């Protein structure tokens, strides 16, 4: 039995680069806003590991986190609130050895992430309840969002002789977001269910082939299949690799449903809009690489191409008359772009001329 307790605390008084601030399409002097706000946070953690017997190993962990962000009030912005964050997570896992090298794992985790406003000044909002405008007062802590996530995984690794390794598993992920005034109906949720299988075949002492497929069912985007194949050929000190994979990225719960307004670093006040019509982002990725591993010198050269469809990006849209009344200067919405192509090359090397000296470098294009 092994227990590990962790305590971490951080604090900054904040700092700023300039007293200039962008406000109402003008750069104005005399601002009291900081580039980095004054803040404090701490994390408590507990980890448990129990080797029940030769076959079964159990783990558990939990964390608790709080953070306070203090904002300065003054020209040119009325900042009635500070920020407060409170998170906690729990996780449990197990690993069970079957015969020989085969084993099963099962993991379950839960996380809750809270974001609040701590009011220090009176704030007459643009929200209404029962026909009355909502007003907040100093000392109130008002929930902005509570995000909860559940992740469950079961995986099995199976060896068939000395040449075949089968990796299979299923995953379930559930996300729930509660955010008054920022989501229609105040609450939204999505789920993802996935299953996968991958076979690694050592065809010869020099050649290893891998093939797999992953199927994903998402609440909003439906079913998607993502195959993958790769090959590794060993020739003396050289390794030659080639791979092809189809990728899948479902839109996040905030990209789908969340609506909010904010300003980053004194920039323009911007409205951000989720989009329930988003499609899943898909990609086709291929790469070829050559590696050399000598006693003193190692190097790797990789070329790759990635063809992306329905890429999810924030796109600027026209500011509505209602947003202009709220002094919003920009408006952006999560949108699927038609296509994107990415080509690149990576080169890295390491050289050890003596026992005590090692040189290394790299270049990416």
Task: Specify the residue positions occupied by each region the protein language model found.
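Gram-negative outer-membrane beta-barrel transporters
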Residues: 162, 202-206, 303-307, 326-365
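Flexible loop and strand-edge segments within Gram-negative outer membrane beta-barrel domains
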Residues: 12-25, 29-45, 49-105, 110-148
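Hydrophobic, lipid-facing positions within transmembrane beta-strands of outer-membrane proteins
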Residues: 1, 42-46, 86-92, 108, ...
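Structural signature of Gram-negative outer-membrane beta-barrels, strongest in the C-terminal barrel
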Residues: 53, 161-165, 171, 175-309, ...
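Extracellular loop and loop/strand-boundary signature of outer-membrane beta-barrel proteins
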Residues: 29-34, 73-81, 89, 93, ...
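Membrane-embedded beta-barrel scaffold of Gram-negative outer-membrane proteins
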Residues: 103-119, 234-235, 241, 277-335, ...
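Surface-exposed extracellular loop regions of Gram-negative outer-membrane beta-barrel proteins
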Residues: 2-19, 55-74, 108-112, 116-123, ...
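Outer-membrane beta-barrel translocator domains and adjoining extracellular loop/strand segments
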Residues: 15-22, 62-65, 70-78, 116-125, ...
């Amino acid at each position: 039995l092994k227990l590990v307790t962790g305590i971490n605390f951080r604090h900054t008084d904040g700092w700023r680069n300039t007293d200039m601030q962008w406000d109402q399409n003008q750069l104005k002097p005399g601002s009291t806003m900081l580039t980095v706000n004054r803040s404090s946070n701490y994390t408590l953690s507990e980890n448990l590991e129990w080797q029940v017997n030769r076959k079964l190993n159990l783990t558990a962990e939990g964390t608790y986190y709080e953070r306070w962000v203090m904002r300065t009030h003054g020209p040119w912005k009325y900042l009635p609130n500070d920020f407060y964050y409170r998170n906690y997570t729990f996780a449990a896992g197990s690993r069970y050895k079957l015969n020989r090298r085969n084993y099963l794992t099962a993991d379950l985790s839960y996380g809750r992430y809270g974001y609040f406003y701590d009011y220090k000044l009176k704030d007459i909002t643009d929200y209404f309840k029962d026909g009355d405008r909502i007003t907040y007062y100093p000392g109130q802590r008002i929930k902005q969002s509570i995000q909860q996530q559940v992740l469950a995984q079961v995986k099995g690794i199976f060896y068939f002789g000395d040449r075949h390794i089968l990796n299979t598993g299923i995953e379930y992920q559930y996300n729930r977001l509660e955010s008054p005034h920022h989501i229609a109906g105040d609450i939204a949720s999505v789920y993802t269910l996935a299953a996968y299988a991958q076979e690694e075949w050592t065809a010869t002492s020099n050649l290893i082939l891998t093939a797999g497929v992953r199927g994903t069912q998402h609440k909003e985007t439906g079913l998607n299949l993502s195959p993958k194949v790769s090959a590794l050929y060993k020739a003396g000190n050289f390794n030659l690799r080639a791979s092809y994979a189809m990728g899948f990225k479902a839109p996040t719960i905030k990209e789908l449903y969340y609506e909010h307004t904010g300003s980053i670093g004194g920039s323009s006040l911007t409205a951000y809009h989720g989009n329930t019509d988003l499609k899943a982002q898909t990609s086709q990725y291929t790469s070829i690489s050559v590696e050399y591993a000598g006693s003193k010198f190692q190097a790797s050269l990789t070329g790759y191409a990635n063809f992306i469809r329905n890429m999810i990006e924030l796109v600027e849209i026209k500011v509505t008359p209602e947003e202009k009344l709220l002094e919003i200067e920009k408006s952006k919405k999560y949108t699927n772009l038609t296509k994107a192509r990415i080509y690149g090359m990576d080169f890295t090397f390491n050289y050890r001329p003596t026992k005590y000296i090692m040189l290394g470098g790299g270049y990416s294009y």
